[in-house]
Amino acid sequence: LPPGISINPSNGDIYGTTDEVGASTFTVTVSGSNAAGDIRTASKTYLIKISDPDSFPYKVDFTLSGYSGSSTLSQFPVLVTFDSGISGFSYNSFASATAGDLRFYAANGEELPYEIETWDTTGVSRIWVRVGSVSGTNTVITAAWGDSSKTTAPDYVFDGSTWSNGYHAAWHFQNMSGVLTTDSTANNRHLTAEGGATTGTGQVGN
């Protein structure tokens, strides 16, 4: 467990306060015996994640108002766009020129995995954020940045975590390298172009 966090061995409650941010694992092992005296032991490993959005000096809230369905979307990637016209946003306030200090958080403080599709400090940047729960038109997520101690992007930015909820592949066609379009999931299902390309209007961009 992180420093300052303890587990009550009698009831399993986790309690305490810590300044350590990040993910850690711990294993709980329980042993007991039945009426015949047979001893049984079981173990389970847990992952605990601690985040601190308040460590970032710059934040912008985004309300996901475009979904009007009646069901709740779980672990759903949503598109967030940045540009200089957003109130409270400036590329110059980032501690990393490549947005290594960018983080996203749910309303409950959970850190959300994301993928940068394009990062353009002179124009519009496009980021896909995997939101744990999207319900109605008032789900709020927070973008945070500017912490000079967190300028290295987390692994989830690059490892396909954004698209891990059953997606077979995810392609951003403007990121074509020659004739190759890379798959953003961890499945590595890259595309090779055959013939010429034609740009058309899509559900999200062209």
Feature locations, PLM:
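Strand-loop-strand motifs at the edges of beta-sheets in extracellular beta-sandwich domains
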Residues: 2-19, 27, 123-126
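Short, solvent-exposed loop/turn segments at the edges of extracellular beta-sandwich modules
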Residues: 31-39
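Extracellular and select intracellular beta-sandwich modules with Ser/Thr-enriched
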Residues: 38-46
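Interdomain boundary/hinge segments at the C-termini of tandem beta-sandwich modules
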Residues: 46-52
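Boundary/junction segments of secreted and surface-exposed precursor proteins
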Residues: 52-74
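Surface-exposed beta-strand/loop patches in extracellular or lumenal glycoproteins
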Residues: 70-95
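A surface-exposed beta-strand-loop module
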Residues: 111-141, 149
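Extracytoplasmic low-complexity segments
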Residues: 149-206
